[in-house]
A protein has these predicted regions:
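Hydrophobic alpha-helical transmembrane bundles of multi-pass membrane proteins
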Residues: 1, 12, 18-472
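Structural signal for alpha-helical transmembrane segments and their membrane-water exit/capping regions
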Residues: 8-10
Length: 472
């Protein structure tokens, strides 16, 4: 009995049993919760009160704004890299004796274009206007002195690299026979006036302007027409006025081969351009949003489809998978998707790219047949496929198409051709009649590197015309 009593006395009571029960697992905060709690404590310490919904919204908006700045600038830097891509493509697809000249034209396109766009072009394109035709404020970034909005700087650099892209398209179409000084005049004129005026019609409301074409609902998200077709039609005007290279066409009118001296350079250039397009199209959101993922996918699919389609088309009709056609096919697909990259499906992007790859092959052959000498196919890639891409943006619009949409797209395409080709045709004729547009036959035969710049890209025996079997 004594043992039982002792045992009973040692048993814990109900309350004691609860106190000695195993404790429940502690709740462990996540890293995000710790950071959030620390932020709240810091706000409380600094302001003496807990953050409100309004202050949280302001903080989130500030983060989004900074992200928009960063993405827009990164995209601008990617598009700037496209200048190197154009230089490599054009240099590789032309003869060695003109390599320095082509590189210098591309460099000066950006240099002269940046100054002209800062001085005049940006104000014409994005300045305030009440007519829908062109802006009249914001020259030399003067708006910053008025509103002190730093977004102006990010937006300006992004639009400047676009303007320079439109200008450099012409370089390839007029390669190997254009006076360097005359080309500089063209570059300034296009970036100061021709490109900005049409840009104001289609994109003016992106800043302070507003254009008649965008008022109709014109779809050109990243510039199949605004950038590429404007540059392509200017290239067509230049090629028509300056005429073909010496020896390009025989007495019977048939084209003679003048192969580029280094298709490896041209291929590297296409890779750089493709890479830069991931800034060109997704960057046109000018916002760090989830939309950039789909735009990047559409861009890539169209470029890939364009290359494959051009390869198959060339293989079928030319009996060889011609490298220049394949390279231009990739670029054609990228140009074609630029207008609709934000408003079509991935499947539609593939279709757009495939058709662009077919179109560019036949377009290059067509211009050769009518004796318009375009050494790199710039007119076909940018002018023709830019027009196709603009039509496709309306035709494959994910939200549906209509006769009104397609009519507006056609109006935009025709307006771009009439404005860019007409204006540049007159400009090139004036230059031709005054200071001269074309080098002499002697200079053209010897190469523009030596006569225009006093330089050589390669040693005298690196690319011997005799050894390589190339035309002089």
């Amino acid at each position: 009995m004594l043992g039982l009593a002792l045992w009973a006395a040692l048993l814990p009571t109900g309350a004691a049993a609860q106190d000695d029960a195993p404790p429940e697992p502690a709740v462990v905060a996540t890293a995000e919760e710790v950071v959030a709690a620390a932020a709240v404590e810091e706000v409380v310490e600094q302001e003496g009160a807990a953050p409100t919904a309004e202050s949280n919204a302001e903080a989130i908006a500030a983060v989004q704004t900074n992200a928009d700045y960063v993405w827009t600038l990164v995209a601008a830097f990617l598009v700037f890299l496209m200048q190197a891509g154009f230089a490599l493509v054009e240099t590789g697809m032309t003869r060695a004796k003109n390599a320095v000249n082509i590189c210098m034209k591309n460099l000066m396109d950006f240099s002269v274009g940046s100054l002209a766009f800062w001085l005049i072009g940006f104000g014409v394109m994005f300045g305030a206007n009440s007519t829908g035709w062109f802006g009249t404020t914001g020259f030399m970034l003067s708006d910053y002195a008025t509103d002190n909005d730093p977004w102006l700087f990010a937006f300006w650099i992004f639009q400047t690299v676009f303007a320079a892209t439109a200008a450099t398209i012409v370089s390839g179409a007029m390669a190997e026979r254009t006076k360097f000084a005359s080309y500089l005049l063209y570059s300034a004129f296009l970036t100061a006036l021709v490109y900005p005026v049409f840009g104001s019609w289609a994109w003016g409301s992106l800043y302070q302007g507003g254009g008649w074409l965008e008022g109709r609902g014109f779809i050109d998200f990243a510039g199949s027409t605004v950038v590429h077709s404007v540059g392509g039609w200017a290239a067509l005007a230049g090629a028509v006025v300056i005429g073909p290279r010496l020896g390009r066409y025989g007495p019977d009118g048939k084209p003679r081969a003048m192969p580029g001296h280094n298709l490896v350079l041209a291929t590297l250039g296409v890779f750089l351009l493709w890479f830069g397009w991931f800034g060109f199209n997704p960057g046109s959101t000018t916002a760090a949003s989830t939309d950039i993922a789909m735009i990047a996918v559409n861009t890539n699919l169209a470029g890939a489809a364009g290359a494959v389609a051009a390869m198959i088309t060339a293989w079928t009709f030319l009996k060889k998978p011609d490298a220049t056609m394949i390279l231009n096919g990739a670029l054609a697909g990228l140009v074609g998707i630029t207008a609709g990259c934000a408003n079509v499906t991935p499947l539609s992007s593939v279709v757009i790219g495939l058709l662009a790859g077919v179109i560019v092959v036949f377009s290059v052959l067509f211009f050769d047949r009518i004796r318009i000498d375009d050494p790199v196919g710039a007119i076909s890639v940018h002018g023709v496929c830019g027009a196709w891409g603009t039509l496709a943006a309306g035709l494959f619009n994910a939200e549906g198409t209509s006769m009104a949409i397609m009519t507006t797209q056609l109006i935009g395409i025709v307006a771009a051709f009439v404005w860019a080709f007409g204006t540049m045709f007159v400009f090139f004729w004036i230059v031709k009649a005054t200071v001269g547009l074309r080098v002499s036959a002697e200079e053209e035969a010897a190469g523009l590197d030596a006569f225009e710049h006093g330089n050589e890209a390669y040693g005298p025996d690196t690319f011997s015309a005799t050894a390589a079997g190339l035309p002089a």
